Amino acid sequence: MDGEEQQPPHEANVEPVVPSEASEPVPRVLSGDPQNLSDVDAFNLLLEMKLKRRRQRPNLPRTVTQLVAEDGSRVYVVGTAHFSDDSKRDVVKTIREVQPDVVVVELCQYRVSMLKMDESTLLREAQELSLEKLQQAVRQNGLMSGLMQMLLLKVSAHITEQLGMAPGGEFREAFKEASKVPFCKFHLGDRPIPVTFKRAIAALSFWQKVRLAWGLCFLSDPISKDDVERCKQKDLLEQMMAEMIGEFPDLHRTIVSERDVYLTYMLRQAARRLELPRASDAEPRKCVPSVVVGVVGMGHVPGIEKNWSTDLNIQEIMTVPPPSVSGRVSRLAVKAAFFGLLGYSLYWMGRRTASLVLSLPAAQYCLQRVTEARHK
């Protein structure tokens, strides 16, 4: 899901200059008819315009944290509340001020659909937790992870219902604004949901799973829009989750801390120097530091800052540990309870339906006629 892609270079006479508002060399087209620009000339012209719009000292919201890579590339991390109009405005302002080369958002390929849905559709989808969604989650993640995903979706649905606001508005704004910036790419920076939930489930004992599920099932505290804005320094959804999983350190590690590492890794991958197009292979390579905007929940910002300068190994947080004996037993117990409850419900509904049908006057009349016919 990249924005505009860089065109292949052709011949052009370029010369590096430094405009007043840019901190890196800008290839300026020296001559030529604007009507007959080559691809390289057009690229250089658009790049020059972009870098001129990029402010040397951008006026950024207070929710933005600036990080600098070893090669001089800059990363502006916008800490957001997932249900906040202010966060959407912060994202728009930051992207317009810094004119980034890459925008990275806290989404994975399993949640990318929210970027293309309109607000009304998202609001309806977020409030509806159907059996079909449960079946899809179980097929995708397995029984335990699927049930956990649905319980967490219930938390999001609760906030959605309380506020009448669809989640992920800041990501949709980032997607729209990135498409307006020349040569800006759009990256998904979050760890895939199935990996996160499977690792989270594997980290809990059977009774911890039961206690967590109980807390999620009976979530009903009212929330106002003022609560969201007051929680701007700590995302509301993540704060509610932190309160519920606070007694489960392993769950916090898998859902929050490990994703901090993954998000940091993806931001560092995006923050690489950009190679400018060359008129010919004989011309020396010219690179400039890149500018990246990251859009993440406010609760992830401290972890990203902490991990920014450390060596990261994401392989170990991408593996799903094999189920333990207790895990297999708990899964069997949950399956048995689920199918037992389903069977009892069908049995009860069948008896209830039969009683209702037999109590109807028409059914009573038919039974009476059958009885009379037998006695004759």
Curated annotation (Swiss-Prot):
CDD domains reported in the protein's UniProt record: TraB_PrgY-like
Location of N-acetylmethionine modifications: M1
Residues modified as Phosphothreonine: T65
InterPro entries xref list: TraB/PrgY/GumN_fam (IPR002816), TraB_PrgY-like (IPR046345)
MF annotations from Gene Ontology: mitochondrion-mitochondrion outer membrane tether activity
Keyword set, alphabetical order: Acetylation, Phosphoprotein
GO biological process: mitochondrial fusion
Segments for region (Disordered): 1-34
GO CC annotation terms, alphabetical: mitochondrial outer membrane; mitochondrion
Record keyword ATP-binding present: no
Feature: compositional bias, Low complexity: 14-27
Protein name stated in the entry: TraB domain-containing protein
The species this protein was found in: Homo sapiens
